[in-house]
């Protein structure tokens, strides 16, 4: 039976400062490192053997993956990185304090941007856009696929092709697969796997640094899930 382990990265320094992060490549906080290493210890204690791992190209997810694999003595496991597993792009909100954004735009508007399924925040500024296009992580990509802002729906539409092309084929061979990513890219996968409604998925909370283990049937249908 295929097993899928989803893990949201440990707390980042911008999570701790209550800032919109998105594609900004910030590091884990000390708490985030502790969350990831503790979960790696749990993987080892439970004897969970991972066959292949996937993560984004953002360091907070990559480092979480490393801590999970290092603490469970599984650094040899093949690891694949893709921009398609990045966090939702928060456009012009990136770098703003969430409370300050509520004061500037209004609490209701910020809530709509954060918790609507198909409404994106304002586009990235020209400076932010230039930085994304110049980032080595995205060299070789058609600039049209690099977002200026995303809704959760937009995030799902870039995540699911990677699920279909890279992740699902590994699961279909019966492997145990780790996906260490971000709150919204994982929401996209959860919506796809469980068939969660548009209305319900936006409020779905995912713990930081805590492996969420899915048991799937041979056709990758949802059977059960639990946090480690």
UniProtKB/Swiss-Prot annotation:
Membrane-spanning ranges: none
NCBIfam families: pgm_1, PRK14115.1, PRK14119.1
Residues at the site labelled Transition state stabilizer: 182
UniProt-listed Pfam families: His_Phos_1 (PF00300)
Name of the featured protein: 2,3-bisphosphoglycerate-dependent phosphoglycerate mutase
GO biological process per UniProt: gluconeogenesis; glycolytic process
Residues where substrate binds: 8-15, 21-22, 60, 87-90, 98, 114-115, 183-184
Top-level enzyme category: isomerase
Protein task: Catalyzes the interconversion of 2-phosphoglycerate and 3-phosphoglycerate.
Reactions it catalyzes: (2R)-2-phosphoglycerate = (2R)-3-phosphoglycerate
InterPro entries: His_Pase_superF_clade-1, His_PPase_superfam, PG/BPGM_mutase_AS, Phosphogly_mut1
Entry EC no(s): 5.4.2.11
Active site: residue positions: 9, 87
Similarity remark: Belongs to the phosphoglycerate mutase family. BPG-dependent PGAM subfamily.
PROSITE patterns for the chain: PG_MUTASE
